[in-house]
Amino acid sequence: MFETIIGLEVHCQLNTKTKIFCSCPTSFGDKANVHVCPTCLALPGALPVLNKEAVKKAIMFGTAVNATINKKSVFDRKNYFYPDLPKAYQISQFTIPIVEHGELFININGENKRIGITRAHLEEDAGKNTHEEGRSLVDLNRAGTPLLEIVSEPDMRSGDEAVAYLKKLHSILRFINISDANMQEGSFRCDVNVSIRPKGDEKLYTRVEIKNLNSFKFVQKAIEYEVARQIDAWEDGKYSELVVQETRLFDTSNFTTRSMRSKEDSAEYRYFPDPDLLTVEISDEMLEEARKIPELPNEKKERYINELGLKKDDAEVIISSYEHAKFFEDLINAGHEPKLCVTWLNVELNGRLKNGLTIEDSPIDSAKMSDLLSRIEDGTISQKAAKEVLDFIMENIEISVDDVIKKLGLKQVSDDATILAVIDAVISKNEQKVAEYRNGKDKLFGFFVGQVMKEGKGAFNPAKVNELLKQKL
């Protein structure tokens, strides 16, 4: 039996308007090499100037994970050569990072588990290489984008735990609004460090790094494959031959890993303090300001339970992502009843999102959902009819709620005179049951409601039917 040891390094792009050491914009998806300057290109004489906003966002993250904020930290040069790194070194923090000794908690099988965060340090992103047949192209728009590298302790023991940690971390970054953490665009990238050891053994064996994973699914699959590969090598007596300290790439076509290069030790990067940048000194005022972070996911959950009366399971679904929570908050801020919001967000809308779609991808936004809930609350349509409206809008996103109600003829009848005429007819047809009801057979009330709704072809407002029936009976 073997135990898996997993540690994660997450590179998170901070959502500052400009790069970490110059004033070039950080926008994504523009034409190649338009957001560059002498500093990005490492032209002689160009000097870096630290972006204060990036420092503030790093402090916010440290606060969110209960970490130590170093009031003095330094930038170092990490020396290596690659085409997308014009200076032939990366400005990073090695000796004294801005954030150390944090933690977050994940829920595994109903149990909370603490995952330590060793450090989080600021650094600049590299450019992007695109490889074509016979040539490689370099785009330096991304070069200099501020990164926060978040390094965990090797506290995870399975792919499930690693994914739970990443989802929790991703959620925190989004909720405190320091990164869009868009995995498809590369603003939330993960390196996985994996090793195995016999159960009960305290020794740490050879660690393999799997580079640049950009989806939770790929993290899970990469860990599963790599653990199986290392166990097979051990059991075949080839562990020292096949499992070496190296960086491996994950092949998304067949869910396997393959060797990329030998893994460097820190000494090989020849770190030394960057002489162009002063020591970062954080004032008490800046520290106090940066620590005023937005409400964290768990804090939202407690508020939803204690103040809005939500069930724990419902609250946990809502805080599962920033987009889900924002959608819910939009509905609450529009004045809708919390439990109605839960039903229509967690059950009705979620249930209609298929093929891996999330609330963020939903064709119906919070404003349109608010319109739908308003029509339920004011009695214009029944909840049953509202489901038809939602189904129609999911396929025809440009149409308004009121237009769908009109088009499908779903508006409820709430006119007293119309409903009373039907009630009188039902009572006249069922005089025996009326007598039984008035003699104490209360359960017959449901019968009368059903008969009135049937005669009204489901178009009557149920609340109004109940109210008028009670008066008549």
UniProtKB/Swiss-Prot annotation:
InterPro entries (UniProt xref): Asn/Gln-tRNA_amidoTrfase_suB/E (IPR017959), Asn/Gln-tRNA_Trfase_suB/E_cat (IPR006075), Asn/Gln_amidotransferase (IPR018027), Asn/Gln_tRNA_amidoTrase-B-like (IPR003789), GatB (IPR004413), GatB_C_1 (IPR042114), GatB_Yqey_C_2 (IPR023168), Gln-tRNA_amidoTrfase_suB_CS (IPR017958)
GO biological process: glutaminyl-tRNAGln biosynthesis via transamidation; translation
A Pfam family of this chain: GatB_Yqey
Top-level division of the source organism's lineage: Bacteria
GO molecular function, one term: ATP binding
Reaction it catalyzes: L-glutamyl-tRNA(Gln) + L-glutamine + ATP + H2O = L-glutaminyl-tRNA(Gln) + L-glutamate + ADP + phosphate + H(+); L-aspartyl-tRNA(Asn) + L-glutamine + ATP + H2O = L-asparaginyl-tRNA(Asn) + L-glutamate + ADP + phosphate + 2 H(+)
Alphabetical UniProt keywords: ATP-binding, Ligase, Nucleotide-binding, Protein biosynthesis
Protein EC: 6.3.5.-
Subunit structure, interactors included: Heterotrimer of A, B and C subunits.
Role: Allows the formation of correctly charged Asn-tRNA(Asn) or Gln-tRNA(Gln) through the transamidation of misacylated Asp-tRNA(Asn) or Glu-tRNA(Gln) in organisms which lack either or both of asparaginyl-tRNA or glutaminyl-tRNA synthetases. The reaction takes place in the presence of glutamine and ATP through an activated phospho-Asp-tRNA(Asn) or phospho-Glu-tRNA(Gln).
Recorded family membership: Belongs to the GatB/GatE family. GatB subfamily.
Record's protein name: Aspartyl/glutamyl-tRNA(Asn/Gln) amidotransferase subunit B
Lineage: Bacteria, Pseudomonadati, Campylobacterota, Epsilonproteobacteria, Campylobacterales
Gene: gatB
